């Protein structure tokens, strides 16, 4: 895609200036002071902004705009709903012991409603949600965490009036400017939708009739969450999406293609058992069940825990957590997929049968190719030795 860089820069700058004129929910807060108090230097911040600009597929010259977007983030109202989930996606951002740039930004954003961190409960919480929707009608971002039970809706009721999760989502989505499904449960159903899916848990996009941007992962990295907020702040539009409505800037490449162990895969060098000599040497984890060849995400680039590490870097294979129905299609997690039959809830309660069956067929076909490559590489290596 070709665009005029200068005009795009100017357009984003004008949009951010307009947003700056909006009322801030915490005008007494200075973002620079927040960073300074957490021991984050200007150099660290510039490095982070540069990395986020690259992650969002923006030129390095747009880094000042990324910083500018951060400064007006407290003008952007966010309503965050919890459905059937473990709160792991929120925990990906809510760190108190060692605050990161991402967690500070999350604290700085105009978070109008988030049940994990708000004081209100019961009738007061319900009123807070209603007031936030009315106050920021058509101007807020809706983020939903968790799958939504539909079989017997009373698997999930909330508030003093026992509204179902589906009812709450529909009500909040009606006046949202943009909607994000945060985590695999909200994006694709998650563990709640795993076979046999007794609660008929559904992803958000099957509950509401508005466009949903999926940000899957179990949990997604904090940068993938914050990055989408920044993108919306700068462009006022949805990012380019893949076939599963995931932002291409975050989910456009396979784990396998960007993995630091890829060279070992190509050379036929594999870990045969956890803890063996090959594991100590950092060989490929495919034979230990790594699902990197079938998974699209940017974990190897952005990593987790303040950019410290990621599952493969820590010695365990990818489990494919950002892919649809991964609990069913990617398990057992410590074994290669090969050409096995996959038992899922595809013919059951909540799945898109046609899409899921096609996806399963393609997944099995891909697995055959991966196994063939692995065996051939191993044979060549043994012959050379």
Question: Which residues does each predicted region cover?
Answer:
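Local cysteine-cluster metal-coordination motifs and their immediate loop/turn environment
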Residues: 84-90, 184, 188, 260, ...
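N-terminal export signals
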Residues: 44-66
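Alpha-helical transmembrane segments
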Residues: 365-378
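Metabolite-binding pocket within alpha/beta catalytic cores that recognizes anionic/polar moieties
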Residues: 70-75, 83, 90, 101-217, ...
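Short cysteine/histidine-rich metal-coordination sites, predominantly Zn2+-binding motifs
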Residues: 277-278, 302-311, 332-343
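N-terminal secretory signal peptides
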Residues: 1-40, 68
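Juxtamembrane/start-of-transmembrane alpha-helix segments at the extracytoplasmic/lumenal side
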Residues: 348-362
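A conserved mid-domain beta-alpha-beta active-site/ligand-binding segment of alpha/beta enzyme cores
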Residues: 230, 234-303
């Amino acid at each position: 895609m070709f665009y005029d860089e200068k005009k795009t820069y100017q357009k984003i700058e004008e949009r951010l200036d307009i947003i700056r004129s909006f009322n801030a929910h915490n005008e007494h807060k200075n973002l620079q002071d927040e960073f300074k108090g957490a021991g984050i230097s200007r150099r660290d911040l510039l490095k982070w902004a540069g990395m986020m600009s690259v992650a969002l597929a923006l030129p390095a010259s747009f880094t000042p705009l990324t910083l500018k977007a951060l400064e007006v983030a407290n003008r952007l109202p966010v309503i965050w709903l919890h459905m059937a989930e473990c709160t792991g996606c929120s925990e990906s951002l809510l760190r108190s012991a060692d605050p990161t740039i991402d967690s500070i930004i999350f604290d700085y954003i105009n978070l109008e409603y988030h049940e994990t961190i708000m004081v209100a409960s019961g009738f007061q919480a319900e009123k807070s949600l209603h007031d936030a929707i009315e106050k920021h009608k058509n101007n807020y971002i809706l983020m939903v965490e968790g799958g939504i039970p539909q079989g017997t809706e009373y698997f999930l009721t909330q508030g003093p009036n026992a509204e179902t999760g589906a009812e709450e989502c529909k009500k909040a989505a009606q006046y949202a400017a943009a909607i994000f499904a945060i985590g695999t449960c909200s994006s694709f159903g998650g563990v709640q939708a795993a076979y046999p899916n007794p609660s008929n848990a559904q992803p958000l996009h099957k509950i509401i009739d508005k466009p949903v941007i999926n940000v899957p992962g179990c949990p997604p990295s904090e940068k993938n969450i914050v990055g989408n907020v920044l993108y919306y702040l700068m462009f006022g539009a949805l990012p380019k999406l893949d076939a599963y409505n995931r932002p291409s800037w975050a989910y456009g490449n396979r784990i396998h293609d960007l993995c630091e162990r890829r060279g070992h895969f190509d050379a036929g060098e594999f870990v045969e058992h956890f803890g063996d000599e090959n594991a100590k040497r950092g060989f490929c984890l495919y034979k230990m069940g790594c699902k990197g060849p079938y998974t699209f995400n940017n974990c190897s680039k952005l990593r987790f825990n303040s950019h410290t590490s990621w599952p493969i870097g820590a010695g365990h294979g990818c489990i494919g957590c950002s892919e649809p129905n991964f609990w069913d299609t990617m398990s057992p997690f410590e074994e290669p997929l090969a050409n096995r039959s996959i038992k899922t809830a595809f013919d059951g309660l909540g799945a898109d049968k046609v899409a899921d069956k096609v996806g399963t067929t393609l997944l099995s076909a891909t697995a055959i190719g991966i196994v063939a490559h692995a065996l051939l590489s191993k044979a060549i290596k043994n012959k050379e030795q």
